[in-house]
Amino acid sequence: MGVLTFRDVAVEFSPEEWECLDSAQQRLYRDVMLENYGNLVSLGLAIFKPDLMTCLEQRKEPWKVKRQEAVAKHPAGSFHFTAEILPDHDIKDSFQKVILRKYGSCDLNNLHLKKDYQSVGNCKGQKSSYNGLHQCLSATHSKTCQCNKCGRGFQLCSIFTEHKDIFSREKCHKCEECGKDCRLFSDFTRHKKIHTVERCYKCEECGKAFKKFSNLTEHKRVHTGEKPYKCEGCGKTFTCSSTLVKHKRNHTGDRPYKCEECGKAFKCFSDLTNHKRIHTGEKPYKCEECNKAYRWFSDLAKHKIIHTGDKPYTCNECGKAFKWFSALSKHKRIHTGEKPYICEECGKAFTRSSTLFNHKRIHMEERPYKCEECSKTFKCFSDLTNHKRIHTGEKPYKCEECGKASSWFSHLIRHKRIHTREKLHKC
């Protein structure tokens, strides 16, 4: 009988050794360990999940778990395979094909770290050994994970795992406290904190509670209006230091968060998280009314207004209500007279960017919209739409008084004056 422990496919790091690896190598380490464990599971050899796996799934540093507990907490964590489970001639073949199929000629010893490193300086050899593993993997690591549902390929198995959850009908992670189901383990971990974290610092103004006193202090500035963090570049002030750090990247152009799939970089980690959904196809925000799903919460919030008919944004001047704040902002320019969009050719100003765009065609003499019936061209798409009614005979504007229909809205307005005159002269 052969015995295979998780240590046989595990790499162990001290804090000093971990610091010697760059971010790409750290990501590679996570992917290798998670993939190896997943392959053990697929062979039916993994009985218990080591703490190291839980640590890696939560993107924590691997050395923060006690070394012995991380890879050998349970005696049953040793994986036994006998002739009844796997015949002797299958053990080598199955293990090499499944566990090592992506690592080419890499020996298992390449996945083990020497234990005689006593200082940061000594771990340079460790890093070069890991670089060897990186080189061996890089040749076969491009788009190695392919989805059998939609055929998409992924460079990183962590992204592939998230993508696979989209097709899973069952929401596999269930909260024992409230019964909520989560598809992604990361979402499940985040949700559990609602129940486990004790929030002992409470705001006296609004009753909101926080787990840290520093968070409460930052929150209080919402009520006081205090903005102690000032940008030296432009003088803008902020309530939180983290917001100032993000703002400074506008001046420096720094984009520290890079997408591993397409290489696009972002200023904020939240922007990178949102962007990744383009690659994974994940749409976590679902409408309860029509089941339509969205990648971003802001899109779901806009969509919900269709069902509710709610118009939460009201103009203080005339009382007109709007579904979206952007529409209210544009409307307010009617009252203020603000015209922020100026033509560089003639200096004429406009309230909307779309109006300026249409105006610029006067100078360029561009008429991009052509009628397929008579070949007449127009500067604006709306003019082409109005013109087409000559050919179709469509009359969408109907008078409520007499039922007469008109092709254009301006004709309906002119027609309505007939009825208003009749009412004025009627005794």
UniProtKB/Swiss-Prot annotation:
Molecular-function GO terms, alphabetical: DNA-binding transcription factor activity, RNA polymerase II-specific; RNA polymerase II cis-regulatory region sequence-specific DNA binding; zinc ion binding
SMART domains, per the entry: KRAB, ZnF_C2H2
Predominant cellular place of this UniProt entry's protein: nucleus
Cellular compartments annotated: Nucleus
CDD domains assigned to the protein according to its UniProt record, in alphabetical order: KRAB_A-box
Record keywords, A-Z: DNA-binding, Metal-binding, Nucleus, Repeat, Transcription, Transcription regulation, Zinc, Zinc-finger
Entry superkingdom: Eukaryota
Positions annotated as zinc finger (C2H2-type): 145-167, 173-195, 201-223, 229-251, 257-279, 285-307, 313-335, 341-363, 369-391, 397-419
Stretches assigned to the KRAB domain: 4-75
SUPFAM superfamilies in UniProt: beta-beta-alpha zinc fingers, KRAB domain (Kruppel-associated box)
Family as reported in the entry's similarity comment: Belongs to the krueppel C2H2-type zinc-finger protein family.
Function: May be involved in transcriptional regulation.
Name by which UniProt lists this protein: Zinc finger protein 736
Taxonomic classification: Eukaryota, Metazoa, Chordata, Craniata, Vertebrata
